């Protein structure tokens, strides 16, 4: 048999002839060191969202499951919150005031509510613990508007002088009407109160001359009661001297302190979903129908599109940036709310808003160009 050729003994590759560690050995040591750091980071809950501990988030909307609620229901249904290590439950609401109160009480961690309602709560409950804070602006402009039938002869806001207006006492537009009234030199208005389902009905049958309400709600409700939209005149507050912010995502003070990373992840996942809703409202409505099977899909699709066009992708929103709020505008609104709502104390604008939890600019760049 053939004999193998003798080979001189080799020194281990990990040791050089002078006894110092080789490049391979150093590489292995660095790898072990990096692995140890990664393991420690995982133990401490640092790193990517996938490594973070799952957080439970109780969220309440401002109103029923309607078109605009797709902004929250889509990212939930598509698993965007879950992928961000968030266990999110979403409940319907019955008004922004109630949502603010329930977030303050701790019943909910986060919510969707009107900024004026948030300011009112702060100013009327200065000593209350756990006051909610707005962390992302969604409706850059208030949807509040005054609506009347053209046959009433009302052609401009000033024509409302001496007229009878109707709205529920807690309606955002009614409460902010003194600001609209001052901006448009309106005098001698009489108010009639009613439950929300009767508001548009009373206008349609002539019991009141005009109503206040969210434009994308009242206009479609009037149409459902047989009124043609061509027969309606509408005065959006945002276009008539009232630069109020609309609805924002709010968080309890306690939740912000205990779960700041969870709030950031929520806003990132929400922004991802909102981008899809704005791009394809018709598809997004299917997620609303999944939560409330009796909705009118065509009607709610129109409601969502109206909300997107009028208050989400508005001129002000594109100027300021989605999700953002500007300090001077907040300060003016705080002063106007203090006066119009006759609050116990003046609204402190700096206490009701925090932009530190917002995603980066790229994530927030979700508004399509017009």
Regions found by a protein language model. Give the residues of each.
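Secondary-structure end/capping motifs
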Residues: 258-342
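Sec/Tat signal peptide C-region and signal peptidase I cleavage site
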Residues: 46-52
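Short, glycine-/small- and polar/acidic-enriched structural segments
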Residues: 52-205, 209-216, 235, 242-243
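Hydrophobic core
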Residues: 38-45
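Pocket-lining segment of extracytoplasmic ligand-binding domains
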Residues: 116, 125, 198-201, 208-297
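Conserved C-terminal helix/tail region of periplasmic/extracytoplasmic solute-binding proteins
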Residues: 330-370
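N-terminal secretory signal peptides and thylakoid transit peptides that target proteins
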Residues: 20-38
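N-terminal secretory signal peptides that target proteins for export/translocation
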Residues: 1-26
């Amino acid at each position: 048999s053939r004999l193998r050729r003798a080979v001189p003994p080799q020194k281990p590759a990990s040791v050089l002839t002078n006894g110092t560690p080789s490049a391979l050995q150093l590489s292995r040591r660095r790898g072990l060191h990096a692995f140890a750091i990664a393991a420690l980071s995982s133990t401490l809950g640092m790193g990517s969202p996938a490594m973070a501990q799952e957080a439970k988030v109780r969220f309440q909307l401002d109103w029923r499951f309607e078109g605009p609620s797709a902004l929250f229901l889509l990212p939930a249904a598509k698993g965007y919150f879950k992928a961000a290590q968030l266990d999110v439950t979403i409940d319907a609401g019955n008004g922004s005031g109630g949502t603010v109160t329930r977030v303050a009480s701790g019943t909910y961690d986060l919510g969707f509510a009107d900024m004026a309602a948030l300011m009112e709560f702060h100013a009327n409950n200065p000593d209350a613990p756990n006051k909610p804070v707005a962390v992302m602006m969604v409706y850059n402009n208030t949807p509040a508007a005054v609506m009347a039938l053209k046959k009433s002869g009302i052609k401009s806001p000033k024509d409302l002088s001496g007229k009878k207006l109707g709205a529920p006492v807690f309606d955002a537009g009614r409460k902010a009407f003194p600001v609209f009234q001052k901006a448009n030199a309106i005098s001698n208005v009489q108010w009639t109160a009613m439950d929300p389902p009767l508001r548009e009905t009373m206008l349609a049958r002539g019991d009141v001359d005009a109503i206040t309400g969210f434009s994308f709600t009242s206009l479609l409700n009037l149409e459902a009661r047989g009124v043609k939209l061509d027969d309606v005149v509408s005065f959006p507050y945002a276009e008539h001297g009232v630069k109020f912010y609309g609805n924002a995502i709010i968080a309890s003070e306690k939740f912000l302190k205990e779960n700041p990373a969870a709030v950031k992840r929520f806003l990132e996942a929400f922004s991802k979903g909102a981008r899809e809703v704005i791009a394809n409202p018709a598809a997004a409505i299917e997620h609303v129908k999944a939560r409330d099977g009796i909705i009118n899909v065509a009607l709610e699709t129109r409601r969502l599109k109206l909300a997107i066009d009028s208050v989400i992708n508005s001129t002000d929103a594109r100027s300021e940036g989605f999700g953002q709020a500007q300090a001077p505008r907040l300060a003016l609104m705080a002063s106007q709310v203090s006066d119009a709502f006759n609050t116990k104390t003046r609204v402190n604008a700096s206490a009701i808003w925090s932009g530190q939890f917002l995603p980066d600019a790229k994530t927030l760049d979700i508004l399509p160009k017009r």
